[in-house]
Every structure is written in structure tokens, then in C-alpha cells.
């Protein structure tokens, strides 16, 4: 009987230790305030990590939580990052641009590089956290020390929001998502200059002069669900975070189809 009691006490102690041990680990750091379009040039502090291939664009499919694909190609060219909550902002931070620089490591160049937010990270390691593509992280290094800097894995950096700049002639592009039909239209927007991100997308079809607000579906994808079928061509009106508006007139043609890409003739300049 005594042996049974001792065994029960031992098991209880082990379970208690497991419970306590399960709560150990790095403390969770609450996110900072959302980053806005206050381009005042002030540098803030953040933690930086990297993911994917050493010289890659991050996500293995060259995409991410914004829904934008082929970020390894120009104009993103692999200079991408996952932003934490106050940077990604539930998708409304998709496409925004930041300068990032590092100084604390001897391998750091101290020169800023510009990255595009195309993905989301959930690691609560700092109020602001950039999980950079391998290429972007290595770009913070002095010439020839890219790999050595990447071996650091995690480091403190400084960052500030900047206006997005694209090559001359680059216009805003719209992608009609797979599975769309006249009652369900989902549109991804990319290559947005200036603020880089969109806070409102509205659609106008051929049957009405009314601008209908679309819902943010996820990432940089906005959708319209309607009982009454929409009829093309469609015009799209975009509102940027700082309140600027542009209209892509009849950007989606009458014979539109899912999984099609349409390049507009407008841009935020």
C-alpha cells in the first residue's frame, strides 16, 4: 500500500514538472502599434530572421500570405519579407515597402535595403519582426559576407516605412482568381506604387453606375459576392492607405475569365 502511495506521488510530481516545463521558453512579446503612412524618416527597432533558400525569395512557392506569386522575379526580385501583425495588418499591409538596415554585427554594411511585404509571420519575438527572404537578409551584409551574416540567424535591425517605387512604366496589375464566376469575383492587386497597399477596392459593372465596395478576402485579394450576376466590363477603383484614389476604367473585359491577368494603365504617382 505504501509502495502504491509512493508511486502515485512520483507520478504526480512528474506530471507537475511536465506542466511547468510546458510553460517554459522565450516570453511572448506583444506586437507594437500598426505602422502607418507617416513617412517621417524615423528609424524604429525590430528583430530580423530569414527563411527559405539562402539566395531565394522566402516561400518555397515564391508566393506567401498575400497571394502574390513569382516574387522571385522582377519587380520584386526576391527582396521580400514576412511582416508581423502591425506590419502585415491582416493583409492590408501587403505590398507596402520598408527600408531595413543592420549595424550590430561586424558583417553588417549599415546600408539600408528596400523590401516588399508579401507574407505574414506569427512569431511573437519582438514588437516588430521581419522574417526576410534569404536574399534580402544577405543583402544587409558587406560585400562577400552575405553567407556569414545569414549564419547569425536572428539579429536586431532598424527599419522605416518608405514609398514603394517601381520601374518606369510599371502599372497596377489585377489577377482574377481561379473559381470566379459572375456571382463571385475575386481580384488580386499587385505592383502598387507609393503607399504600396490598398485599404479599399470597389467595383463597377456595366449594369450600374454605382461603385460597390469589395471585401478583403485574404492577403491582397478582394472579393465581391452577389446574388445578381455582374456583367463586364468592370472598372476598379482603388483607395490607398493615405486616401489617394485611382480608377482602372473597364480593366476587366466583358469576356473575362478566371485565372487571367489584366494590366491597367494607372498607377499611384
Curated annotation (Swiss-Prot):
S-S bonds: 66-94, 97-164, 102-108
Glycosylation sites: 34
Domain of life: Eukaryota
Alphabetically ordered keywords of this record: Allergen, Cell wall, Cell wall biogenesis/degradation, Disulfide bond, Glycoprotein, Membrane, Secreted, Signal
Entry keyword Secreted: yes
Signal sequence extent: 1-24
One annotated GO biological process: plant-type cell wall organization or biogenesis
Coarse class of the protein's main subcellular location: secreted
Matching CDD domains: DPBB_EXPB_N
This protein's record includes keyword Nuclease: no
Location of the protein in the cell: Secreted, Cell wall; Membrane
Expansin-like EG45 domain boundaries: 63-169
Membrane topology note: Peripheral membrane protein
Cellular-component GO terms for this entry: extracellular region; membrane
Expansin-like CBD domain boundaries: 183-264
Expressing tissues: Expressed in anthers and pollen.
Functional description taken from the UniProt entry: May aid fertilization by loosening the cell wall of the stigma and style, thereby facilitating penetration of the pollen tube. Acts selectively on grass cell walls, which are relatively poor in pectins and xyloglucans and rich in glucuronoarabinoxylans and (1-3),(1-4)-beta-D-glucans, when compared with cell walls of other angiosperms, including other monocots.
Annotated family: Belongs to the expansin family. Expansin B subfamily.
Protein's name according to its UniProt entry: Expansin-B9
Organism name: Zea mays
Amino acid at each position: 500500500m505504501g509502495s502504491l502511495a509512493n508511486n502515485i506521488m512520483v507520478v504526480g510530481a512528474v506530471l507537475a514538472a511536465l506542466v511547468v516545463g510546458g510553460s517554459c521558453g522565450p516570453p511572448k512579446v506583444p506586437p507594437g502599434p500598426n505602422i502607418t503612412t507617416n513617412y517621417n524618416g524615423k528609424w524604429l527597432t525590430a528583430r530580423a530572421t530569414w527563411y527559405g533558400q539562402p539566395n531565394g525569395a522566402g516561400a518555397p512557392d515564391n508566393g506567401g500570405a498575400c497571394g502574390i506569386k513569382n516574387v522571385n522575379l522582377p519587380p520584386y526580385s526576391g527582396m521580400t519579407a514576412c511582416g508581423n501583425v502591425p506590419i502585415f495588418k491582416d493583409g492590408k499591409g501587403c505590398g507596402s515597402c520598408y527600408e531595413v538596415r543592420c549595424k550590430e554585427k561586424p558583417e553588417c554594411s549599415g546600408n539600408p535595403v528596400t523590401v516588399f511585404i508579401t507574407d505574414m509571420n506569427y512569431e511573437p519575438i519582438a514588437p516588430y519582426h521581419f522574417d526576410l527572404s534569404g536574399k534580402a537578409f544577405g543583402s544587409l551584409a558587406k560585400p562577400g559576407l552575405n553567407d556569414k551574416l545569414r549564419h547569425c540567424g536572428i539579429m536586431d535591425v532598424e527599419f522605416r516605412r518608405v514609398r514603394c517605387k517601381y520601374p518606369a512604366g510599371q502599372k497596377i496589375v489585377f489577377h482574377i482568381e481561379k473559381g470566379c464566376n459572375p456571382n463571385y469575383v475575386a481580384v488580386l492587386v499587385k505592383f502598387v506604387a507609393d503607399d504600396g497597399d490598398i485599404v479599399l477596392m470597389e467595383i463597377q459593372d456595366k449594369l450600374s453606375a454605382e461603385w460597390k465596395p469589395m471585401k478583403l478576402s485574404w492577403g491582397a485579394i478582394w472579393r465581391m459576392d452577389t446574388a445578381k450576376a455582374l456583367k463586364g466590363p468592370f472598372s476598379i477603383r482603388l483607395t490607398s492607405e493615405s486616401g489617394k484614389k485611382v480608377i482602372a476604367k473597364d480593366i476587366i473585359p466583358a469576356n473575362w475569365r478566371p485565372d487571367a491577368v489584366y494590366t491597367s494603365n494607372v498607377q499611384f504617382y
